């Protein structure tokens, strides 16, 4: 894998540059060109195995439209999010709990009751989610707003979708970031190790649509580093890998 990956990255980088030249200006201050897109606007996809596939590589594993986890990737240390005292449902890896609890306490101090809407999702569950998108919206839309099985950060067990107690699911708002909970998370989640994976205006960089509710845990130190880098998490991970 280590011998084949540099070639893939080199090819991808060249292709990105060609696409950038053809597609006009990119998003300012990103430091990286956008992913390649088909004429129809959908991100080009691949099915390459992520290089960092061990459970101890959780902070390095890149899953995106190109790279995926294996179908058997299922961390053995999953625990209910309720262990953190937060409202909602789902499972996360055990080491996420302490900072998730701290995030929830800080939000409560600000008068906000966070709720976890979705957390760990197995390969088979993600397959069902994606197929549902395809059946309802068609493949071209599905590939832009949902991940294929293996390509979802939720399978890592370190990613959560948030809303708030008494509120609707976050995707039912015109912009979840405009709610008190969404705005608070955007400003503060990184302080507790959680990074917004798919920010607004970066769709060409992330390969997915804007999701102001979707946060991946990297730990406080790495989250601060990612924030300081100015890069979207996908490209920050590419550089770290």
Language-model segments: residues:
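Extracytoplasmic cell-surface/polysaccharide-interacting catalytic and binding patches
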Residues: 2-8, 12-119, 123-241
């Amino acid at each position: 894998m280590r011998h084949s990956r540099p070639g893939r990255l080199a090819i991808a980088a060249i292709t990105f540059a060609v696409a950038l030249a053809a597609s006009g200006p990119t998003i300012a201050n990103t430091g990286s060109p956008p992913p390649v897109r088909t004429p129809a606007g959908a991100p080009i996809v691949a099915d390459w195995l992520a290089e960092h596939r061990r459970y101890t590589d959780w902070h390095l594993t890149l899953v995106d439209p190109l790279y995926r986890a294996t179908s058997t990737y299922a961390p053995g240390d999953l625990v209910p999010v309720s262990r953190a005292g937060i409202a909602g449902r789902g499972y996360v890896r055990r080491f996420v709990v302490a900072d998730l609890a701290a995030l929830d306490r800080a939000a409560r101090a600000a008068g906000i009751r966070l709720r976890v809407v979705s957390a760990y999702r197995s390969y088979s569950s993600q397959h069902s989610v994606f197929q549902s998108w395809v059946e309802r919206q068609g493949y071209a839309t599905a590939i832009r707003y949902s991940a294929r099985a293996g390509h979802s950060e939720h399978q890592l067990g370190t990613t959560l979708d948030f809303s708030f107690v008494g509120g609707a699911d976050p995707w039912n708002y015109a912009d979840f970031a405009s709610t008190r909970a969404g705005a608070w998370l955007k400003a503060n989640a990184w302080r507790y190790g959680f990074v917004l994976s798919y920010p607004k205006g970066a769709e060409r960089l992330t390969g997915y649509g804007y999701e102001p509710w979707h946060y991946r845990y990297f730990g406080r130190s790495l989250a601060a580093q990612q924030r300081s880098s100015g890069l979207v998490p996908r490209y920050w991970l590419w550089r770290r890998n």
